[in-house]
Regions:
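Short acidic-hydrophobic, aromatic-tinged amphipathic segments that line or gate anion-handling sites
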Residues: 2-8, 90
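Residue-level signal for inorganic ion chemistry
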Residues: 27, 81, 120, 180, ...
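Glycine-rich, highly charged phosphate/nucleotide-binding loops
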Residues: 68-77, 101-107
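Phosphate/ribose-recognition catalytic cores of enzymes acting on nucleotide-derived substrates
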Residues: 197-247
């Protein structure tokens, strides 16, 4: 998989199978879209392209102090997208000017200009353009003009819960990591830097690693004790995590 963070570095795409979205958390709803993209791209022998954005649109539109809690930071998101077998991931810069494009300019000057899609696989609730007035019907109305086909992926349900990033966040904010994992299709994860503590645990026979999560917008589960897997230098270890001020 190839990852691009700058539109000027993109290859000269001719025909592609694309999908577009924030993909925060890369949950089972997102995965249903990505599976369709991958299967279709393989069937028609065209490259699969996932287009996502950085920073998160709300941080641009509402400011960096917006109460945004992300399930995945950009590197975490691209890692999960890679596991879905995509050929290309494009992390497009999201700016105020980009958000103010008309839906027509978004289609012609962004999607068609850079990706020349043959197929656009998209979720039922996708919106785009200034004030989010563009939607899936708007894309469908432009199929003939630009020669692409729009494929809509319907809302996904698990245990009568409509899968969404919002529902995953709600579960995590309550400490319900089991429901979050079921909706996500994977365990919730975060990464950070090990920082030196008072080494009290080591003194009583339970050495610990203090992890600093420095991005203020990364969602961290509430205070509590959690069973975890820890990846360190390519090896997975079982562990216990305490989240709180002092164990």
């Amino acid at each position: 998989m190839k990852i691009f963070h700058n539109l000027s570095e993109l290859p000269d795409f001719k025909n592609t199978v694309i999908t577009i979205g924030s993909f925060d958390g890369v949950h089972t709803g997102h995965q249903s879209i990505l599976k369709r993209v991958k299967a279709l791209a393989e069937a028609v022998k065209l490259p699969s392209v996932v287009i996502t954005f950085h920073p998160h649109p709300r941080l641009v539109l509402e400011g960096n102090n917006a109460p945004v809690q992300l399930l995945t930071l950009t590197d975490e998101k691209t890692y999960l997208l890679e596991k879905q077998g995509m050929d290309y991931v494009v992390v497009a810069p999201f700016t105020k000017a980009f958000s103010e494009q008309s839906p027509d300019d978004y289609i012609e000057q962004f999607l068609v200009k850079y990706f020349k899609p043959k197929y656009i696989v998209i979720g039922y609730d996708h919106h785009f353009g200034a004030k989010r007035v563009g939607n899936i019907d708007y894309l469908k109305n432009n199929q003939t003009k630009f020669g692409f086909e729009v494929i809509e992926i319907e809302k996904q349900f698990i245990d009568d819960i409509a899968v969404s990033s919002t529902q995953v966040r709600k579960a995590l904010e309550k400490g319900d990591v089991a429901t979050a994992a079921k909706l996500s299709g994977h365990y919730y994860s975060f990464s950070g830097t090990v920082v030196k503590g008072q080494q009290i645990g080591r003194g009583i026979g339970f050495p610990t690693a203090n992890i600093a999560v420095t991005d203020p917008h990364k969602l961290v589960p509430p205070h509590g004790i959690y069973a975890v897997f820890v990846w360190h230098k390519g090896t997975r270890h079982k562990g216990m995590m305490y989240r709180g001020d002092r164990p």
